[in-house]
C-alpha cells in the first residue's frame, strides 16, 4: 500500500518490483494478503494521522505489517512497540532491502531496517512494478534535500541530496519509453538543484537536453525552485521538443518577512521579477505554485501582500495549504502562532480569488487544437477523459472528449489524440477529437 507523494510512490513501485522478482505473489487488495507492506507518509500531521489510521485498521484485521517510508524513518522503534502486528520497519533509504527483511521475518525476527542517515537512491537497475498505468510514469532524478526550510522535516526523513547520473536517468527513461510511456514526470525534492552534489553545479538543463532524444512525447518537470530557473534552464524548456512548458514552482509566500521566517531568504524580492522573466522567455509557460498561509508571524499586512501577489500574477493552478506545526522544525517554536480558524479563513480567501482566475485561464484554451493523452473512458457520460499539457496528473484538471462515432473505434486508453477544445469550466476542459 502506498500513502503520500509520488516520490514515495516510486519507492513503493521498486519494492513491488523486488518482491515480484523474488517470487512473491503481489496483491493490491489487503484482504487477500497474509502480510501487508505499507509505505507511509509523515510530512505533516494530517499525513501521519492517515498513515496511523491505515496501520490500525490493518492491525484490527490481524494482518502482519511491514511499515516502510517516512513514518518508519520518523518514529522508528516506537512503531514496533506500539503496533504488535508490525513485524518490521523499513526507512526511506532502506527499501531496497525488502527481500532480506522478509526473509528475516520468516525466521521469526522483528526487524528494524532504518538507516539514521539515508544515503541510498534507486536507479534503472532496480526492478520496478509500475502502478500508474501504461502511459504515465514518474522518474526520480534525485533523493533528499540540502535546504532547511523552517516548516519542513524532509531533510530529516530523506537525508541530504543525492543525484543520479545523467546516464542513469536517460537509461531509465529509455526503458520507460519501450514500455509505452507517453508522459514522463521528473521529480525530486528540488529538481532545479539536480546535479549540484554530483557534478558541482546544477545540471538540470544538461539533463533536459539529453532527455530530448528519448522517444517519449511529453516530459514534465515538478518541484522547480525559483533560483534554479536560470536562463539556461528556460532555454532548454523552449528548445527541447518534448519538454512541456509547465512550471511547478513551490513559492510558498510572497512577502519578504514571511520568506525570511520560512528560512527561504534566497527568494526575497525574487518572485515577481522571476515570473516576469520567465514569461518573457517562455510565453507559453503554464504556472502552478503552492502557498502556505497562517505561517507563524504572518500578519494581515503580510497576507494582503500575498493576496495582491495572487491577483497580479494570475497563476494557472494554485495549491493552498494552512501551516502545519511539525515537531523538530524551527517554525514549531516561532512566536506569534496563527489560530487555525484564521489560517483556514485565509486559505478560503486565496481559493476564492484564484477560482475565477483559473476558470478564465481555462477559457483561454477554447478554440485551440491540442494533444490529449487518454486515461479512461466514462461510459456514463459517453466521454473519454484525459489531459493536455495544461494539466498534470492528480493535482490539475482533465480534458473530457465527447465520443464521436467517427473516431470511437480509433481511440484507446493510453494513446494521444488531437482534439479541439470547445468548452471550459473552473477545473476542466471539454473537446472533440479532430
Swiss-Prot record:
Domain of life assignment: Bacteria
Entry protein name: Ribosomal protein uS12 methylthiotransferase RimO
GO molecular function: 4 iron, 4 sulfur cluster binding; aspartic acid methylthiotransferase activity; metal ion binding; protein methylthiotransferase activity
Naturally occurring in which organism (per UniProt): Prochlorococcus marinus (strain SARG / CCMP1375 / SS120)
Binding site for [4Fe-4S] cluster 2: 145, 149, 152
Origin organism lineage: Bacteria, Bacillati, Cyanobacteriota, Cyanophyceae, Synechococcales
Localization annotation: Cytoplasm
Enzyme superclass (EC): transferase
Protein family membership: Belongs to the methylthiotransferase family. RimO subfamily.
Cofactor: [4Fe-4S] cluster
Annotated InterPro entries: Elp3/MiaA/NifB-like_rSAM, Methylthiotransferase, Methylthiotransferase_CS, Methylthiotransferase_N, Methylthiotransferase_N_sf, NA-bd_OB-fold, Ribosomal_uS12_MeSTrfase_RimO, rSAM
Amino acid at each position: 500500500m502506498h500513502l503520500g507523494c509520488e516520490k514515495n510512490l516510486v519507492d513503493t513501485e521498486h519494492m513491488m518490483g523486488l518482491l515480484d522478482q523474488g517470487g512473491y505473489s503481489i496483491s493490491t487488495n489487503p484482504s487477500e494478503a497474509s502480510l501487508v507492506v505499507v509505505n507511509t507518509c509523515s510530512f505533516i500531521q494530517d499525513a501521519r494521522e492517515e498513515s496511523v489510521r491505515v496501520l490500525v485498521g490493518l492491525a484490527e484485521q490481524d494482518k502482519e505489517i511491514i511499515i516502510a517510508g517516512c513514518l518508519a524513518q520518523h518514529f522508528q522503534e516506537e512503531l514496533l512497540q506500539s503496533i504488535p502486528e508490525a513485524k518490521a520497519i523499513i526507512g526511506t533509504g532502506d527499501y531496497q532491502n525488502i527481500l532480506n527483511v522478509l526473509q528475516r521475518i520468516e525466521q521469526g525476527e522483528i526487524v528494524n531496517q532504518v538507516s539514521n542517515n539515508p544515503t541510498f537512491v534507486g536507479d534503472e537497475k532496480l526492478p520496478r512494478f509500475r502502478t500508474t498505468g501504461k502511459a504515465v510514469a514518474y522518474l526520480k532524478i534525485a533523493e533528499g534535500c540540502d535546504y532547511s526550510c523552517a516548516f519542513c522535516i524532509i531533510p530529516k526523513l530523506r537525508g541530504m541530496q543525492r543525484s543520479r547520473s545523467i546516464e542513469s536517468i536517460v537509461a531509465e527513461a529509455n526503458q520507460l519509453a519501450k514500455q509505452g510511456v507517453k508522459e514522463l514526470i521528473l521529480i525530486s525534492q528540488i529538481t532545479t538543484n539536480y546535479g549540484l552534489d554530483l557534478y558541482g553545479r546544477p545540471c538540470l538543463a544538461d539533463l533536459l537536453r539529453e532527455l530530448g532524444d528519448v522517444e517519449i512525447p511529453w516530459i514534465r518537470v515538478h518541484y522547480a525552485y525559483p533560483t534554479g530557473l536560470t536562463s539556461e534552464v528556460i532555454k532548454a524548456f523552449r528548445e527541447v521538443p518534448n519538454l512541456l512548458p509547465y512550471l511547478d514552482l513551490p513559492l510558498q509566500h510572497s512577502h519578504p518577512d514571511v520568506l525570511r521566517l520560512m528560512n527561504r531568504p534566497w527568494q526575497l524580492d525574487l518572485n515577481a521579477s522571476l515570473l516576469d522573466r520567465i514569461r518573457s522567455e517562455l510565453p507559453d509557460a503554464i504556472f502552478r505554485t503552492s502557498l502556505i498561509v497562517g505561517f507563524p508571524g504572518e500578519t494581515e499586512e503580510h497576507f494582503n501582500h500575498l493576496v495582491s501577489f495572487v491577483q497580479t500574477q494570475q497563476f494557472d493552478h494554485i495549491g493552498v495549504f494552512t501551516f502545519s506545526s511539525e515537531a523538530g522544525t524551527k517554525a514549531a517554536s516561532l512566536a506569534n502562532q496563527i489560530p487555525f480558524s484564521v489560517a483556514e479563513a485565509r486559505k478560503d480567501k486565496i481559493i476564492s480569488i484564484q477560482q475565477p482566475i483559473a476558470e478564465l485561464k481555462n477559457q483561454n484554451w477554447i478554440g485551440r487544437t491540442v494533444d490529449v493523452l487518454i486515461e479512461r473512458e466514462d461510459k456514463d457520460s459517453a466521454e473519454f477523459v484525459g489531459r493536455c499539457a495544461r494539466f498534470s496528473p492528480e493535482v490539475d484538471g482533465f480534458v473530457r472528449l465527447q465520443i464521436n462515432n467517427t473516431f470511437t473505434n480509433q481511440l484507446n486508453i493510453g494513446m494521444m489524440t488531437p482534439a479541439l477544445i470547445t468548452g471550459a469550466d473552473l477545473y476542466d476542459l471539454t473537446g472533440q477529437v479532430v
